[in-house]
A protein has these predicted regions:
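Aspartic protease
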Residues: 3, 8, 16-118
Length: 118
């Protein structure tokens, strides 16, 4: 079974005076939120010790992370951390924990369940 992926336009708000609109890939198979290196001004990111392997099992080069940015859609914003990655095909990838923030669900041995009330 292949992970689900889809695209949507969001606003990435790094600070009150630095934000941009971008088409992101939302990927149920991704383990981290990623932004293409070069999209974020250097004064906003910091050194990272994160490690990440791509879908084709190659080590991705991660030197920096961004911890205080928000992703916004229809004026609803979520603060989520990102790693900055060189040579990505997509400018921004949002991961499974981001999807879980929107709609909490649990993957268990016997299937996927959700509790919309808590």
């Amino acid at each position: 079974m292949l992970p689900l992926k889809w695209f949507t336009k969001v606003k990435i708000a790094v600070s009150h005076d630095y934000h941009f609109n971008v088409i992101v890939m939302i990927d149920c198979g991704a383990d981290m939120n990623c932004i293409q290196e070069g999209l974020i001004l250097s004064k906003y990111f910091e050194k990272s010790t994160e490690r990440l392997v791509s879908a084709n099992d190659t080590q991705m080069k991660i030197k920096y992370e961004l911890n205080n940015a928000h992703v916004c859609y229809n004026n609803v914003c979520f603060k989520i951390p990102y790693v900055l990655v060189k040579n990505m095909t997509d400018k921004v990838i949002l991961d499974l924990p981001f999807i879980n923030a929107l709609y909490p669900f649990f993957v268990e041995h016997d299937g996927i369940t959700t509790d919309p009330f808590g």
